């Protein structure tokens, strides 16, 4: 995790908890390496911080097959579309919208490059980051129904939360180092 160690060191003091959590959540546990790193890649892509994504990709590529990384990136892209669409349908609350066909291509959900169940777990984690209740419920039902334990789901969402927080903390790092306008004027 050399690339992520550099990211952790770049996090400012206000993000000390995130620095510690970023190391902890990626340690071996109930998730397989493919699940752990796939969730990290997918949620880093969803967080849209290039520096964090590059570091997680570097470390993930050293740990898992290329197909896992491809699926994780595909999950982030597909969920960027689906989370907006299905969150809208849920939020507006009109049955008429829910009755309309989505007519959006989602072939990668059906035919991932690696494991279908792992792809669903990546999609669940991204959906949690993006705040789509409908997608979270749907993907959680699929993965648990497919044999993924609630402990594994819980760990995936913990990774998602910490990766998202790390992206925010990296943005803070640039602001924490710069003096405030009020201090500069005083």
Swiss-Prot record:
Active site residues of this protein: 132, 135
Keyword Oxidoreductase: yes
Entry's Gene Ontology BP terms: cell redox homeostasis; response to oxidative stress
SUPFAM superfamilies: AhpD-like
Cleaved signal peptide residues: none
GO MF terms, alphabetically ordered: alkyl hydroperoxide reductase activity; disulfide oxidoreductase activity; hydroperoxide reductase activity; peroxiredoxin activity
Swiss-Prot/TrEMBL keywords: Antioxidant, Disulfide bond, Oxidoreductase, Peroxidase, Redox-active center
Reaction(s) this enzyme catalyzes, per UniProt: N(6)-[(R)-dihydrolipoyl]-L-lysyl-[lipoyl-carrier protein] + a hydroperoxide = N(6)-[(R)-lipoyl]-L-lysyl-[lipoyl-carrier protein] + an alcohol + H2O
Covalent S-S links between cysteines: 132-135
EC number(s) stated in the UniProt entry for this protein: 1.11.1.28
Keyword Lyase: no
Function: Antioxidant protein with alkyl hydroperoxidase activity. Required for the reduction of the AhpC active site cysteine residues and for the regeneration of the AhpC enzyme activity.
Family listed: Belongs to the AhpD family.
Stated name of the protein: Alkyl hydroperoxide reductase AhpD
Organism: Anaeromyxobacter dehalogenans (strain 2CP-C)
Lineage: Bacteria, Pseudomonadati, Myxococcota, Myxococcia, Myxococcales
């Amino acid at each position: 995790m050399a690339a992520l160690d550099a990211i952790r060191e770049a996090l400012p003091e206000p993000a000390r908890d995130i620095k510690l959590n970023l190391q902890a959540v990626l340690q071996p546990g109930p998730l397989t390496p493919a699940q752990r790193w796939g969730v990290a890649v997918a949620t880093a892509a969803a967080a849209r911080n290039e520096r964090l994504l590059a570091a997680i990709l570097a470390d993930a590529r050293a740990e898992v097959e290329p197909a896992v990384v491809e699926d994780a990136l595909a999950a982030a892209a597909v969920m960027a579309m689906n989370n907006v669409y299905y969150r809208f349908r849920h939020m507006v609350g009109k049955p008429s919208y829910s009755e309309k066909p989505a007519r959006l291509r989602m072939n990668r959900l059906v035919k991932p490059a690696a494991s279908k169940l792992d792809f669903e777990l990546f999609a669940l984690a991204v959906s949690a980051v993006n705040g789509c209740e409908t997608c979270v419920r749907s993907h959680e039902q699929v993965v648990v129904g497919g044999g993924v334990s609630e402990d594994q789901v819980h760990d995936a969402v913990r990774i998602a939360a910490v990766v998202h927080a790390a992206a925010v903390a990296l943005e803070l790092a640039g602001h924490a180092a710069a003096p405030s306008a009020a201090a500069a004027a005083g």
